[in-house]
């Protein structure tokens, strides 16, 4: 995807070298935006092969409201292993905030259910927002949310989504985030009876770890291929009813994966 390669190149050429929490060191820019028209194909990297199974199962795990990695491990997904405790728990991370945000009266708010209901009943609202950043619980999370707030927008029979990501690991994290939120947009669009529009990805601290420079240069030397298309079973009309087998990526051709260390 040209949008992603442009981001990589921009950070390599224009970024500032800074320290970071992990001690690895980063080169970063503050404030960057990419836009993907979901009618033009499914936004997934073709300059390195991504593990789509992990992307889909992680999203389904979020939507289940789960915060233990048991479901992920059962489905061969290890991307959260480094942050889980000995019991597999992560604290009140994404799933808890999306599905069970604590309310002042002692109850809980299901932001995803409210989102779908709001789009159906009042599509022109400017309040179709889900937040994973809960200041009251952020210190209890194994990893505070990097992709922390998203908003939906309806126009001309299409549903678009904008994600704000406060912290963006460009080489390892951002490719997953692009595909994950593009897929979420398509899923929500299907259950509310709209066509997918744009996915807009807004980054706060967009950074490339110093030990990812060689991998980034290798990827920048590759030429992007045509985007594939995502086929979703059309009979699923409940946002919580999707399973892994409901998705099929058609025509995905990509260069070999590029390994890089995770900064924990």
From Swiss-Prot:
E.C. designation(s): 2.1.1.45
SUPFAM superfamilies according to UniProt: Thymidylate synthase/dCMP hydroxymethylase (SSF55831)
GO cellular component: cytosol
Family as reported in the entry's similarity comment: Belongs to the thymidylate synthase family. Bacterial-type ThyA subfamily.
Name used for this protein in its record: Thymidylate synthase
CDD domains noted in UniProt: TS_Pyrimidine_HMase
Annotated positions binding (6R)-5,10-methylene-5,6,7,8-tetrahydrofolate: 51, 169, 263
InterPro entries: Thymidate_synth/dCMP_Mease (IPR045097), Thymidate_synth/dCMP_Mease_dom (IPR023451), Thymidate_synth/dCMP_Mease_sf (IPR036926), Thymidylate_synthase (IPR000398), Thymidylate_synthase_AS (IPR020940)
Span of the signal peptide: none
HAMAP family the record matches: Thymidy_synth_bact (MF_00008)
Organism expressing this protein natively: Rhizobium johnstonii (strain DSM 114642 / LMG 32736 / 3841) (Rhizobium leguminosarum bv. viciae)
């Amino acid at each position: 995807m040209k949008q992603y390669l442009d981001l990589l190149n921009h950070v390599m050429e224009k970024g500032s070298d800074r320290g970071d929490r992990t001690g690895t060191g980063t080169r970063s820019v503050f404030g960057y935006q990419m836009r993907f028209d979901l009618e033009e194909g499914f936004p997934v990297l073709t300059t390195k092969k991504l593990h789509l199974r992990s992307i889909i199962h992680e999203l389904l795990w979020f939507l289940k409201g789960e915060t233990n990695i048991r479901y992920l491990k059962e489905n061969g997904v290890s991307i959260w292993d480094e942050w889980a405790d000995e019991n597999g728990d992560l604290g009140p991370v994404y799933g808890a905030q999306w599905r069970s945000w604590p309310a002042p009266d002692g109850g809980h708010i299901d932001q995803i259910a409210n989102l779908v209901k709001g789009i159906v009943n009042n599509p022109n609202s400017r309040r179709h927002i889900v937040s994973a950043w809960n200041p009251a619980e952020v210190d209890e999370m194994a990893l505070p949310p990097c992709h922390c707030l998203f908003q939906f927008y309806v126009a001309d029979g299409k549903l678009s989504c904008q994600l704000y990501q406060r912290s963006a690991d460009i080489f390892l994290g951002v490719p997953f985030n692009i595909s994950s939120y593009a897929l979420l947009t398509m899923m929500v669009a299907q259950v509310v009876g709209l066509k997918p529009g744009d996915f807009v990805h807004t980054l706060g601290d967009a950074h490339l770890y110093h030990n990812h420079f060689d991998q980034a240069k290798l990827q920048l030397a590759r030429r992007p291929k045509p985007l594939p298309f995502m086929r979703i079973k059309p009979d699923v009309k409940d946002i919580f009813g999707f399973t892994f087998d409901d998705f099929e990526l058609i025509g995905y051709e990509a260069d070999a994966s590029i390994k890089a260390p995770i900064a924990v």
